[in-house]
Amino acid sequence: MSNDKQLKAVAFGEVLWDIFGNEKKIGGAPLNVVLRMKALGADTDMISCVGKDPDGDAIINEVEKLGLETNSILRSDDYPTGLVNVTLDERKSATYEILYPSAWDKIILNEETRELVVNADVLIYGSLVCRDEVSRNALYELLNTHTYKVFDVNLRKPHYDYDILKDLMQSANFIKFNDEELTEISEAFDSPYNTLEENMNFICSLTNATAICVTRGKDGALLLWDKHLYENNGYFVEVEDTVGAGDSFLGALVSCLLTGKEPQEALNFACATGALVAGSAGANPEISISQIQNLMHKR
């Protein structure tokens, strides 16, 4: 994929270590999204916080190795770098124990981080970072900017409530759910509908969002864009683990859509990207454009 223009993308939220037994991999949904966007040609920044501890030093080193600037990843004297214990079930689906409090719960903005968002084409944020009021208040301030906003819903019990989710949805131009999240949130807001398509339109009617995407695991995804519905039924891969697959999907989709790609082409590209991540270990495997295109044309 060649970008017609270079996107400037900023993500706000958690940067942490995913712990798989004796192994740890860098993660955090917003970081995963912008890493994929960077791999696809975007100019990216990550606003977060890690501890002044060995885990934090290791994250800074790792992020620099991955080619991201670390100036907007702040350091905390008082809180440790975030850790998540990841457990995979027999279907290789992940469950998460997210330790609290962590440094990313305590993100405090400065002039540089505010300026990054004001000058960006797109701000990507999730719901998990709002579990603590310090980071939540920082995000709410950024949501007052005119930058295009992408909300990556990330329901991790018990770290969310519906009032905050409603605020986050109403601030977004684009909202991404998985199918279970869309169903849960639609029911919580008294949707009379049963299908994903109906509930996508229902969420649009509740919010200011003009685009909604819903992932369906191995069955691909739906995209509501400019009042048209697009669908991809998924690409087959042998699943290694699902960690980060939805994040890479979103990074690819936003990169394509905001650089002028046709919505169906963008959705196909994003579904193939997410599938290849699910077929690889960890949240941020290296994936080439040719691998993505080969999978798109394979079926």
What would you call each of these model-derived segments?
Residues N32-L35, V118, Q170, Q264, ...:
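A broad detector of short, well-ordered amphipathic alpha-helices
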Residues L16-I19, R156, E181-T183, V237-E238:
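A short, flexible beta-alpha/helix-coil linker loop
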Residues K5, A9, D18-V84, L88-S93, ...:
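Substrate-binding N-lobe of the ribokinase-like
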Residues I19, E97, E184-I185, V277, ...:
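Residues that scaffold the ATP/ADP-binding catalytic core of kinase and kinase-like folds
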Residues N85, Y96-L99, N232-N233, L253:
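Beta-strand scaffold of nucleotide-dependent catalytic cores
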Residues M1-V10, E62-K65, T70-L74, E90-L229:
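Ribokinase/PfkB-type carbohydrate-kinase core domain
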Residues M1-K8, F189, Y193-R299:
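Conserved phosphate-binding/catalytic region of the ribokinase-like
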Residues G13:
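Active-site beta-alpha turn of Rossmann-fold NAD(P)-dependent dehydrogenases/reductases
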